[in-house]
Amino acid sequence: MRQSLIYNSIEVIAYNLNRQNNSLKLFELGKIYGKHNNKYLEERRLCISIVGEVFQMNWNIQQSPDTFFYGKGLIIDLFETFGYNNLKFNNVDHPDFVFACEISSQNIILGYYGLVSMKKREKYNIEKEIYLADINWSRFIENCFTKPTYFKDLPKFPSIKRDFALL
């Protein structure tokens, strides 16, 4: 029984890096187990990890964006899709990260995001930076869609754009 998805994610990243897959965007959804105040806990967690270049270089993309902010944007998009609009990232100390942000909404801690510490990466001989998000999926699902979702009918006719040139 595992207590965190972080170590398994780092192991998968090491496996892929050893096989020359240098740019990775991975996720894992699973259960973790633990004990808190003489009670046994079982929680679902979502672990998102990003390593290497975010986009492949081509004529249109000269420089890849900063991986930290790409991951933060990915997390914000995920949360907004499920109805979280007032998301906060607060800097905290976390034993698994060099620097970490606590992801919270309405004073409910939903997870952590940051750069995995060198100590954790050295165990698997990984030199590249690993940005990882550990989201408490059980808590995430309980609190999503607090507002009702509204849908609009699709248009019956396709949109028409006209360009008039008058002389």
Report the location of each language-model feature.
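Extended beta-strand-rich architecture
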Residues: 1-167
